[in-house]
Amino acid sequence: MMIMKVKEVMNKDFIKISPNDIGGEVVQTLYKEKKNYAPVIEDGKLVGWITALDLLIGCKHSKIEDLMLLIDEIKILKENDEVTDELIDEIIKNEDIAYPVINDRDEVVGTLSVFDLLKYYKNR
């Protein structure tokens, strides 16, 4: 497997959700953008992660902060991490769709999804 950095594969054009956003509005945004996930960001920093499944079981009137996964409940990638066989195996084992990607200042700079990896490998 060719070693590459997360930042070479990640999606830099991602949806940014606030903890104060309302579930129903986020559902519409995700649907419109054809996404199943989004980082929850406050002051440029990752504070959580929301998925379509979280929204499905939550209330459309709830704030995202009440529905999101907290940062200690998710895997966070750094943009200079390497995409290794171990990472790929972890994605497969956990059936994860995507991860948030941060830089050295803990600012969200992108997301890495299974689809980003597939596109990268297809276009090599």
Curated annotation (Swiss-Prot):
A molecular function (GO) term: DNA binding
Keywords carried by this UniProt record: CBS domain, DNA-binding, Repeat
Signal peptide from the UniProt entry: none
Superkingdom per UniProt: Archaea
Transmembrane segments: none
Keyword DNA-binding (UniProt): yes
Domain notes: The CBS domains bind adenosine derivatives (AMP, ATP, NADP and SAM). The CBS domains can also bind calf-thymus DNA and E-boxes recognized by transcription factors. Binding of the nucleotides induces protein conformational changes.
Name of the protein this chain belongs to: CBS domain-containing protein MJ0729
The species this protein was found in: Methanocaldococcus jannaschii (strain ATCC 43067 / DSM 2661 / JAL-1 / JCM 10045 / NBRC 100440) (Methanococcus jannaschii)
